[in-house]
Every structure is written in structure tokens, then in C-alpha cells.
């Protein structure tokens, strides 16, 4: 029985939540393995919108288990809020449906304060952090001074660890010119309370998943952000603080590499990016504004307008390589309807030379100018179409050209926001 990893193949916001939601029908367990509540999944089911930032998108399916792995940085405030919201809508009737790793690191109040203060101090050099404490939490994890969920469940241990960490956090904030309220007793009291709320969901996730596999369960690993934001393989330093690529799926939940059978990359039919960093195919004209307006390109987490551009085949081919993609699900194909022509970036012009592969040096990428291939557009609306043969010939030609340029088959197409507005050409769980 195959286990499937879903990753963003661009700069995040590709529509992973919708595809994971769709594929959850064929899985028994959905696993989040990295990132935190800086990601936002917007799901529309029967016209009803749900936005989740931390809990896996599969939670909307009754009877499915959802797991938050050790690689996730965990904000218990957000978790409790999402649990309460789901329960108010009868979407989490059984607490055993949700499992959280005891070893996931916890986002503490000082992490958020440091994140915001650092970004403000950078001025024009801002990287576009969401200010939710993700980076500082990963930093503490690597420096071996972080707090984990298991620490919230022991009041004495929590008090000791807060007492150890808080002075250095206050000192850094003071250097940054920030003076947030960080009361030790209040933090210990609040996070003890949050620990009591989280305790019923906390478990040894590695062992839990191992037993699930032994019992023949199918796993769906849900990535956050996108390949181009990976801390090692993205446009460093304009990246997130975790590994977003498929190789991290098993590391972030305590399994071995043989647990993965299929890797599905999610890509929009065009491209978007939030925050700073190189983006060769960016459109800063009325075409870019048109894509933003039609596509509703505003962050689910921050509400910030996204930068928009044509599809970048070099970046997508790079994502296929570093993730080992078996297939691509292309989202928002419907947004391109009505454009007289559609373009694909097929090269970069840098210092008078044309490159046909994405350079590993982000400073070269910063100077790159996209070289485009132009294809005829289509006027037909796609939202009500449900099969490949129903698509306009020019839309099919566009998809086929992307396949040729990237070297990976397109196995799914999204033609609208609702779960039902999807054309699945190949089911990864049956590939």
C-alpha cells in the first residue's frame, strides 16, 4: 500500500491544502512534518470555507487520523483555538482522531517577540517573516535550549526551563530595542494550562506511526510552505527555517525513508511569492495585478498581497529534482482563462548569458531576467469541467507543454476553490 508525500513545488501557497483534503479520502492518516502556523490552508467544501494553520487539512474527514510530527514547531495557543473552532462545527467529534508528537518544539511568547523585533530592526533587509516565532523556535531547537510539548506536561520542568531561558530572551529583546511584557509566573501558568489541554493528544508519534504501518494503514504526508523556501534548497536567506522538501517528511515524524512510495508536487498554473527574495518571472504590471485579483492572491495567514508572475519552468524542474517528484498537481488553471496569451519562463538571462537551469547562487537569481515562451490563451471558463477531454484544446496544450519542460507528468488539475472542482488524472495512492 503506497504512502504519499505532498509538497509545495514553488514558493508556498500552491493549494496543497485542497489537494491533501482531496487525497485524504484514500489515506488513513495525514501527517504534518515541518513548519508551524506560518502556513495557512484554505479549504472550501460545499461552499463552506475553513482556514487551518496548524492542524492537518485531513481533519475535515470523519474517521481519519491526523498527526503533528516532531518536525513541526507548535504554538499551543493556535492549536487550542483550532480545536475549539473545529469542535464548534462538529468537525472533531473524536479526540483520538488527532495526535501530536511529544517531541515537537513549542513556540513560546519570547519567540514571537524576538521574531517581530528582529524583522523591524532589519529595515529594508526584511525577509518577510510572518512574525509568529517560527524561526526563533527552530533556532532554539538547534541550539538545544528549546522547550518541547513534553515539557508543558510537567509543571516543575516547565517552570525550570522558562526560568533558564527567559533572561537571555529578555536580554536579546533589550538589544533590539523591544520591551514586551514577559512575566515569568504568567507564562508558566498559561503554558501549564495549555499543556493540560494538549495532553490528551500528545503521544510518541514515531511509535504510533510505526504501528499504523504495521497494521496496513496508508499515510499521507502534508508539507507546508514550498520547495523554494527550504532552508537548504531554497533562495537562501529568503527562506523559512525548516526543510520543506520531501526528504524531510520522514525525519519530521520519526520514520525511515522506505516509508515513502510517491511524491506529489503542487504547483499553480502561474506562480506567486510572499515576502522578499529573487523571483525572475514576477510581473509588476497590470497583468500581475490581474492575476492577483482573479486568483485572490492574498496570504491565508498574513493577508498580505502575494507577488505574482508567470509559471517558472526552471524553478519547477528544480523542485522536481530536489523532491524526486513522481507527479504534479496543477492548481488554479481556471485563473488563466481569458488571457489572450499565457507565458512560461523557459530560461534566465543573466549578465548577457541565457541559462536553461536554475542557478544555485541566489545572487545570480536576483539579477536574472526571465526568458519566456508564449502560448495562445483560452477564453472558456473551466470551473464546471470535470474531465481532461472537456478542457479547451489550448488549456490542454498548456498543461502538456509544462509536462515537457519539467519532465514530470501532471496527474491532477484544480479548476476552482471547491473540493469538487478537481480533475484527478492519476491517483497517487493507486500509481
UniProtKB/Swiss-Prot annotation:
Pfam families reported in the protein's UniProt record: Adenylsucc_synt
Binding positions for GTP per the UniProt entry: 12-18, 40-42, 306, 332-334, 414-416
Keywords per UniProt: Cytoplasm, GTP-binding, Ligase, Magnesium, Metal-binding, Nucleotide-binding, Purine biosynthesis
Cofactor note: Binds 1 Mg(2+) ion per subunit.
Record InterPro entries: Adenylosuccin_syn_GTP-bd, Adenylosuccin_syn_Lys_AS, Adenylosuccinate_synth_dom1, Adenylosuccinate_synth_dom2, Adenylosuccinate_synth_dom3, Adenylosuccinate_synthetase, P-loop_NTPase
Residues given in the record as IMP binding sites: 13-16, 38-41, 130, 144, 225, 240, 304
Gene Ontology cellular component annotations, sorted alphabetically: cytoplasm
Example of a GO MF term: adenylosuccinate synthase activity
Cofactor list: Mg(2+)
Family indicated by similarity: Belongs to the adenylosuccinate synthetase family.
Protein's UniProt name: Adenylosuccinate synthetase
Organism: Anaeromyxobacter sp. (strain Fw109-5)
Amino acid at each position: 500500500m503506497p504512502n504519499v508525500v505532498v509538497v509545495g513545488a514553488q514558493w508556498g501557497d500552491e493549494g496543497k491544502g485542497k489537494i491533501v483534503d482531496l487525497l485524504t479520502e484514500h489515506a488513513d492518516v495525514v501527517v504534518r512534518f515541518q513548519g508551524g502556523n506560518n502556513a495557512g490552508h484554505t479549504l472550501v467544501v460545499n461552499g463552506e470555507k475553513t482556514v487551518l494553520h496548524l492542524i492537518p487539512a485531513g481533519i475535515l474527514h470523519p474517521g481519519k487520523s491526523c498527526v503533528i510530527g516532531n518536525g513541526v514547531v507548535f504554538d499551543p495557543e493556535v492549536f487550542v483555538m483550532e480545536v475549539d473552532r473545529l469542535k464548534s462545527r462538529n468537525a472533531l467529534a473524536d479526540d483520538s482522531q488527532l495526535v501530536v508528537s511529544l517531541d515537537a518544539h513549542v513556540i513560546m511568547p519570547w519567540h514571537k517577540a524576538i521574531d517581530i523585533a528582529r524583522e523591524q530592526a532589519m529595515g529594508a533587509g526584511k525577509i518577510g517573516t510572518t512574525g509568529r516565532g517560527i524561526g526563533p523556535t527552530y533556532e532554539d531547537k538547534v541550539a538545544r535550549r528549546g522547550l518541547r510539548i513534553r515539557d508543558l506536561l510537567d509543571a516543575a520542568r516547565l517552570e525550570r526551563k522558562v526560568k533558564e531561558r527567559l533572561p537571555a530572551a529578555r536580554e536579546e529583546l533589550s538589544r533590539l530595542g523591544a520591551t514586551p511584557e514577559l512575566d515569568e509566573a504568567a507564562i508558566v501558568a498559561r503554558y501549564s494550562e495549555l499543556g493540560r489541554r494538549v495532553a490528551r493528544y500528545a503521544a510518541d508519534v514515531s511509535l504510533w506511526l510505526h504501528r499504523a504501518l504495521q497494521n496496513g494503514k496508508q499515510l499521507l504526508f502534508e508539507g507546508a510552505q514550498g520547495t523554494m523556501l527550504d532552508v537548504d534548497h531554497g533562495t537562501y536567506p529568503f527562506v523559512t527555517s525548516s526543510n520543506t522538501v520531501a526528504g524531510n517528511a520522514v525525519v519530521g515524524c520519526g520514520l525511515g525513508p522506505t516509508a515513502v512510495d510517491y511524491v506529489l508536487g503542487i504547483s499553480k498554473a502561474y506562480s506567486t511569492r510572499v515576502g522578499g527574495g529573487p523571483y525572475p518571472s514576477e510581473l509588476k504590471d497590470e497583468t500581475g495585478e490581474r492575476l492577483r485579483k482573479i486568483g485572490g492572491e492574498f496570504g491565508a495567514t498574513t493577508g498580505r498581497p502575494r507577488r505574482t508572475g508567470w509559471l517558472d519552468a526552471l524553478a519547477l524542474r528544480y523542485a522536481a529534482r530536489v523532491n524526486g517528484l513522481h507527479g504534479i498537481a496543477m492548481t488554479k488553471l481556471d485563473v488563466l482563462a481569458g488571457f489572450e496569451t499565457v507565458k512560461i519562463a523557459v530560461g534566465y538571462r543573466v549578465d548577457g548569458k541565457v541559462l536553461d537551469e536554475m542557478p544555485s547562487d541566489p545572487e545570480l537569481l536576483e539579477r536574472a531576467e526571465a526568458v519566456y515562451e508564449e502560448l495562445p490563451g483560452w477564453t472558456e471558463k473551466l470551473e464546471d469541467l470535470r474531465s481532461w477531454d472537456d478542457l479547451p484544446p489550448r488549456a490542454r496544450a498548456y498543461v502538456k507543454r509544462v509536462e515537457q519542460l519539467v519532465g514530470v507528468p501532471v496527474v491532477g488539475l484544480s479548476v476552482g476553490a471547491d473540493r469538487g472542482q478537481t480533475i484527478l488524472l492519476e491517483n497517487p495512492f493507486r500509481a
